[in-house]
């Protein structure tokens, strides 16, 4: 039942965004995905480094703890970490295509791990990701 709801959700979202493509706000959508993860019990903590507790130069997210890491702390492990897109920290910055992809990789990792339970990604979500990275 849960998988059918997820399939419906992303199918609906594709159709909805098709009508709103001129007004689509990527920042708001990623915020929605992060809030959806939080509401289902998987909140990402992007406010400070989980090791040094600094709030500056946050660059990575640990896939194990879902918490941010500073560049200095994360650099030796960067191949095992997710990238924290800068626009999630700097609210007024322009969002590049690369940052869009980083943000979707970040949320997609946690969707696949916790909501889709490492099953094959929902096809509708794949189509949705392709769509919004081209807006």
Curated annotation (Swiss-Prot):
Listed Gene3D superfamilies: Recombination protein O, C-terminal domain
InterPro entries the UniProt entry points to: ARFGAP/RecO, RecO, RecO_C
Domain of life: Bacteria
BP-aspect Gene Ontology terms: DNA recombination; DNA repair
One Pfam family in the UniProt entry: RecO_C
Name of the molecule in the record: Uncharacterized protein RP549
Organism of derivation: Rickettsia prowazekii (strain Madrid E)
